[in-house]
Amino acid sequence: NTATPYTSTVVFLVRKGNPKSVKDWADLVKPDVKVITPNPKTSAGGRWNFLAAWGYAYNQDKDTAKADAFVGQVYKNGPVIDTGARGPTVTFAQRGLGDVLPTWENEAYLVLQEFGADKFDIVSPPSSIYAEPPVALVAANAERKGTTKAAQAYLDFLYTDRAQAIFAKHHYRPIKRE
């Protein structure tokens, strides 16, 4: 399981009816499409978005310069580049700025629950990133703090049926340890 108890991917949250017809990463560089995304220098979610966009562009013709330019244009289409992953969600869902919010799949579903499925649609692009957030016990830290047993129990719990059901309930993609 490569030390990850669940996975996710980056999807697009768009306004209801998808008025800008956003279907794939290439749509994010259209001049009339405003992209709301976090800064990849300050946000882990922003880094996943950056990597997903870059991977899409690179896979078009294996040209790193073109992939760099593509991602640069995605960010130029951003009227606001927030510092954290939650900021862009607030900017998009509450403040009503932008046409598309690239975000983790679970976050997109949370927006539907919090703000109403009648206001937004989720678009799954044909290609995206396979996000695997890792977990690990750092032995030196756990030993120094006397928390090794608790840390190991927590790690073991993450792969139980109960924890996997919790991940699924919150729109993450569970993964069972073999």
How would you describe each model-predicted region?
Residues N1-T42:
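N-terminal segment of the mature folded domain
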Residues A3-T7, D27-K30, A44, A93-G96, ...:
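Extracellular/periplasmic catalytic domains that process cell-envelope and extracellular macromolecules
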Residues V11-L13, D121, P134-A136:
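Residues embedded in well-ordered beta-strands
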Residues F12, G17-K20, P40-G45, N106-Y109, ...:
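Solvent-exposed loop/turn segments at secondary-structure junctions
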Residues V14-K16, V33-Q60, V74-G78, V123-P125:
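Short beta-strand->loop
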Residues G17-K23, T42, G55-D63, N141-A151:
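Short helix-loop capping/hinge motifs at secondary-structure junctions, enriched
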Residues A142-E178:
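Extracellular/periplasmic juxtamembrane helices and adjacent flexible linkers that interface
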